[in-house]
Regions:
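A short, exposed loop/beta-hairpin motif centered on an aromatic-Gly-Thr core
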Residues: 13-27, 50
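Acidic, low-complexity, intrinsically disordered interaction modules
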Residues: 26-27, 34-36
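Short aromatic-glycine-(Arg/Gly/Cys) micro-motifs in beta-strand/loop hairpins
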Residues: 1-17, 47
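Short, mixed-charge low-complexity intrinsically disordered segments
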Residues: 36-64
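Short linear sequence elements within intrinsically disordered, low-complexity coil regions
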Residues: 8, 15, 22, 37-40
Length: 64
């Protein structure tokens, strides 16, 4: 199991796996902090159990 980053785009209701799997929690947190956001996008960092550890949101567009 690995730490993963998930994305939900503006006006979407579906979370999409971003293709990044990291075994180290520290490396996952550092990568997540630097991951670029698209306008209106929401990103989640999830632990190996699928629990959301952190969430970032671009607020340049309203969210639904």
């Amino acid at each position: 199991m690995a730490y993963t980053i998930w994305s939900k785009l503006y006006h979407s209701t579906t979370w999409v796996f971003c293709g990044l799997q990291l075994d180290s929690e520290k490396l996952a947190e550092q990568t997540f902090a630097m991951y670029p956001l698209a306008p209106g996008e929401t990103l989640q960092l999830r632990d190996p159990d699928g629990t959301v550890m952190d969430e970032r949101r671009d607020n340049s567009r309203p969210h639904s």
